[in-house]
Amino acid sequence: MRKIIHIDMDCYFAAVEMRDFPEYRGKPLAVGGSSDRRGVISTCSYEARKFGVRSAMATAYAFKLCPDLILVPGRMQVYKEVSLQIREIFSRYTPLIEPLSLDEAYLDVSECQQYKGSATLIAQAIRRDILAETGLTASAGIAPVKFLAKVASDLNKPNGQYVITPETLPDFVKTLSLRKIPGVGKVTAEKLSSLGLNTCGDVQAYSKPELLARFGKFGGVLIERSQGIDERGISADRERKSVGVETTLAKDIYSLEQCQQVMPGLIQELALRLSRSAKERKIHKQVVKLKFNDFKQTTIEHRSDEVSIVMFYDLLAQAMARQEGRGIRLLGISVGLADSILAVPEIPNAQTQLDLAL
């Protein structure tokens, strides 16, 4: 049985700011773009979260929830330098490290002999080292499989950890909400709920052939995850080829204008994900994807090392020309990443690599 640790830094960008600027401590603080440029919140302190402020939220709306919010621009170079420190700490315990972003990673410590091979003690040691050497706290989840380690890391935040052992896994999974399974978003969860499926235990008791008939390949994944099965290994040399975001719509939409109304939220989320990328790399294309209500899809791309919102809207219009009267059930945007590293100055906010000036 594998031993997987998921490390997640606690409100990372904001925590770095509070470490370096003590006057921010204990106050509602957010890192993100300014409201007058339609900025988005990258992350925020726990004090800000008490007011309902969240990552990926429009900055203007965050100020409505918390008028006393302190907003600071991101210092991406600093965040990257600290992330490298944290990565070096990971490497003391295992070479099998899969970074997900600057502030989280999977570690496979199955072969680690330190602390007599106890993943629980290894996670404690890693968190202790991070605090001692960076002044930042981290939370951890420990489990035999990746997705449950990630779920567990969120259960004892901040500055804590949660363990799912092989013995406790069956009972833990049985009551786990399906929303915790990767790929189950709001719309999919509603469809599952309409079938009486809300927890992994519900799926375990449901007809497997019917799930496969209704959800195809994803139905098979759902069956496995609901039993706590996740055979994915740690991709130690993983390098993302693209960064994207998509949304499955609650109801099919049919007009270009309706699709255009969905775009601002997608663009804000894409900007946030780009700002959290572990490396700055050249962008070589941008892409718009539509999935129709007959489950066929189309993609339109534009090759360029400069990305603009205007082009996203142009690509959307081109994709809609292929609609042929069908309803749109999913809309997505992404950028393709080249192998070489960017040699341009840092843009210190959540709009990194996106020209948000229409």
Swiss-Prot record:
Family: Belongs to the DNA polymerase type-Y family.
Amino-acid positions noted as binding Mg(2+) in the UniProt annotation, renumbered to this chain: 8, 103
Cofactor(s) required for function per UniProt: Mg(2+)
Free-text function comment from the UniProt entry: Poorly processive, error-prone DNA polymerase involved in untargeted mutagenesis. Copies undamaged DNA at stalled replication forks, which arise in vivo from mismatched or misaligned primer ends. These misaligned primers can be extended by PolIV. Exhibits no 3'-5' exonuclease (proofreading) activity. May be involved in translesional synthesis, in conjunction with the beta clamp from PolIII.
Bound cofactor: record note: Binds 2 magnesium ions per subunit.
The entry's keywords: Cytoplasm, DNA damage, DNA repair, DNA replication, DNA-binding, DNA-directed DNA polymerase, Magnesium, Metal-binding, Mutator protein, Nucleotidyltransferase, Transferase
Localization: Cytoplasm
Organism: Shewanella baltica (strain OS195)
Highest taxon, organism lineage: Bacteria
Matching HAMAP family: DNApol_IV
Taxon lineage: Bacteria, Pseudomonadati, Pseudomonadota, Gammaproteobacteria, Alteromonadales
PANTHER family documented for this protein: DNA POLYMERASE KAPPA (PTHR11076:SF33), DNA REPAIR POLYMERASE UMUC / TRANSFERASE FAMILY MEMBER (PTHR11076)
Gene Ontology MF term list: damaged DNA binding; DNA-directed DNA polymerase activity; magnesium ion binding
NCBIfam families per record: PRK02406.1
PROSITE patterns: UMUC
One GO cellular component term: cytosol
Cited SUPFAM superfamilies: DNA/RNA polymerases, Lesion bypass DNA polymerase (Y-family), little finger domain
UmuC domain residues: 4-185
Pfam families: IMS, IMS_C, IMS_HHH_1
Protein name: DNA polymerase IV
Residues annotated as site: Substrate discrimination: 13
